[in-house]
Structure formats: structure tokens, C-alpha cells
Regions:
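Secretory targeting signatures
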Residues: 1-39, 64, 294-322
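Short loop/turn motifs at secondary-structure junctions
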Residues: 18-21, 120, 259
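Local sequence-structure signature of Cys/Sec-based thiol-disulfide redox active-site neighborhoods
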Residues: 42-94
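Extracytoplasmic
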Residues: 51, 82, 119-121, 186
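Soluble periplasmic/extracytoplasmic beta-strand elements of cell-envelope proteins
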Residues: 55, 125, 190-192
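Short, solvent-exposed loop/turn and secondary-structure capping segments
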Residues: 67-71, 100, 135-137, 201-203
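Thioredoxin-like thiol-disulfide oxidoreductase module
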Residues: 79, 89-131, 135-155
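Short, conserved sequence motifs used for protein processing/export or organelle targeting and
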Residues: 102-116, 142-148, 159-322
Length: 322
């Protein structure tokens, strides 16, 4: 194999190119999501285009101590990754959680088909991959994100328009959709609503802060095979115009101070199993929330660069001592 020399030591060209690719993925901006600062006035409609984002799903509860430790940092982590990931959190209907949205429980039941036994909190799943359990599993989550990005070569192309109505509700409607050959006739389009800075009400066990982020409150699913809405919860209205999910699928939801709305192309519920890959075909997110300050972003960027640099030094050290 051809090799790249560095003094008396050498590195595999393949390893070098792969490391370079990882750096490009980490530090090159992407345009698969749109974030609008909630402190600004909303005075226009927004076109959201993409599909390449990776869906990162978290199972969490408001009473979970380990969740309380890591949750405050996850929004900054999501900001550090930018549009490369779309992170949401499901809170179960367990009788103890302070939120228990039916839409979250629906998505948990979907995960139970592909990940039997899921239930520990916090649990993270990157694009339908392995369960990563516990707050100390975050390095594995980061590794999964990088691995899936390298493999995510042909995502579906998604676009929707988000607008604010006269009564302060919001409507998201499909603008265009190209499956790129993914999941033809056996897939669905899903609008998912996640609310940010949700106040934890009194009377519930809460070892963490007063608010939680990325709580999934709304889900609406449109089957592309028969152009029907097969599930809807947490939305004021879900409808299909022109009898077409691809062109006429739209949802309206109540006024929310801060939120994310995701459009996902994924397998239908009936075609999920623990023996088949359950990764999504395409994901794009629109976020309307308060942006983390630039210093937090700069610190996280320094950390990411630092870890990458340490990785190169460690690889050099390993080769030097062979």
C-alpha cells in the first residue's frame, strides 16, 4: 500500500485521508437546517431545505439524575455540530415524568420495535443505530455521528415552508420532496414538533434545572404509499392537499415561544424490525429558539479542534513506537 512519509515514520494514506475527511465533516458548515433567533420578531415565512442531517433520539425523564447532569449541555453540543444532527428527546408515559406527551410515547413505541428492551435513561440512538446508555456514553454517541455521516451519501431531498398565522399558530407545509430512490412506496413523511425551554411543573421529582429542551410534543405521519395520515398527536391540524403527501402534507401547531419542527423521511411503522436497519432516509430541521452565546460556541469549537489534534498526536505516537 502506498504510504505518506513523515520523517522516519509513516502513516497509511488511507488513514490520513480518512482523518482529513473527519476534520472536514467537523469543521465545514452545512446548510441542511435553519435556526432563527427567538429574540427576533417573526415577520416572514421561511423555506427550509436539506435532508442530510442525522436524527439523534434521546430517551429521558424529568426524574432521572443522570439525565439532569447531561441535559443542560446537549443544546450546546447540538449547536457545535450545527445542522449535521437534529436532536430530539422523548419523555415516556410512565406516571412519573412531568411531561408525558403522547407523541413522545408513540416514538418510544416505534423504537421498541427496532431496539427491544429500550427503557434506560438517558439513552441515545444516532440514526437508528446502537443504544448508547448513560451520560458517560457520549463519546460513543460522537463516534456514531461521525461514522453515520461518512455513510450518509444519498439522503432524500426535503423542503418545507414554515409560516406564522394571524392567531400566532404556526403552519409547516411540504414544498418539495425527492426520495432519491430511498424507501419507495414503503416509507412515510413525518413532521415532528419539539419544544424548547419547557418549564417542569411543581409536584414532580426533578433533580435537574427548571426547564428541559427538545421535548417532543407533536408528531404527524403521512404514508407515501396510500397518501393518508396514519398518526397525528400534538398538532392543531394535519392535512393533505391534492391527495399527495409529497406535495400537500401540512401541519398547524399552537403558539410556542421556542421550538424545532423536523421533516423526516423514514420507514413506515409496519416495516420496522430489530433485524433490519432503521436509519432515516432524510432529515431537515427548522429551529426557532434563543441562540447560545458565541463564547459557548467558541469554547466547544476549541474543544473539538483540541480532541482532533490530540488524536493526530496519538496516532503519530503509536506509529513512532511500532
Amino acid at each position: 500500500m502506498a504510504r505518506w512519509s513523515l520523517g522516519d515514520h509513516s502513516l497509511s494514506v488511507v488513514k490520513f485521508l480518512f482523518s482529513t475527511l473527519v476534520c472536514i465533516i467537523l469543521f465545514t458548515p452545512s446548510s441542511s437546517a435553519l435556526i432563527v433567533d427567538a429574540s427576533d420578531d417573526w415577520n416572514e415565512s421561511f423555506l427550509v431545505e436539506g435532508g442530510r442531517s442525522l436524527l439523534v433520539e434521546e430517551l429521558s425523564t424529568t426524574w432521572c439524575e443522570n439525565c439532569a447532569e447531561i441535559d443542560p449541555y446537549l443544546m450546546e453540543v447540538a449547536d457545535a455540530h450545527g445542522s449535521r444532527i437534529a436532536m430530539v428527546t422523548y419523555h415516556p408515559t410512565d406516571g412519573f415524568d412531568a411531561f408525558q406527551p403522547p407523541a413522545s410515547q408513540h416514538r418510544i413505541e416505534r423504537l421498541e420495535l427496532t431496539h427491544p428492551g429500550i427503557g434506560s435513561t438517558p439513552t441515545f440512538i444516532v440514526d437508528g443505530g446502537q443504544q448508547r446508555i448513560g451520560s458517560d456514553s457520549w463519546p460513543d454517541v460522537q463516534k456514531d455521528i461521525l461514522s453515520e455521516e461518512v455513510k450518509n451519501l444519498n439522503p432524500s431531498e426535503l423542503a418545507f415552508v414554515i409560516s406564522k398565522n394571524d392567531n400566532d399558530s404556526f403552519t409547516a407545509s411540504i414544498q418539495s420532496f425527492n426520495s432519491k430512490g430511498n424507501g419507495d412506496n414503503i416509507s412515510q413523511l413525518t413532521f415532528m414538533l419539539a419544544k424548547h425551554s419547557q418549564l417542569v411543573p411543581d409536584g414532580f421529582d426533578n433533580p435537574g434545572g427548571s426547564h428541559r429542551d427538545r421535548v417532543v410534543y407533536g408528531v404527524s405521519e403521512c404514508n407515501l404509499q396510500n397518501n393518508s395520515i396514519t398518526y397525528s398527536s400534538g398538532m392543531l391540524n394535519s392535512n393533505i392537499d391534492d391527495n399527495s403527501c409529497k406535495n400537500g402534507f401540512a401541519v398547524t401547531f399552537e403558539p410556542v415561544d421556542q421550538f424545532s419542527i423536523l421533516l423526516i423521511h423514514e420507514k413506515v411503522y409496519q416495516n420496522l424490525s430489530s433485524e433490519e436497519p432503521s436509519s432515516s432516509y432524510g432529515v431537515v430541521e427548522f429551529a426557532f429558539r434563543n441562540l447560545e452565546n458565541n463564547q459557548s460556541w467558541n469554547n466547544l469549537l476549541i474543544i473539538l479542534i483540541g480532541f482532533t489534534f490530540i488524536g493526530f498526536l496519538w496516532k503519530y505516537y503509536e506509529n513512532k513506537n511500532k
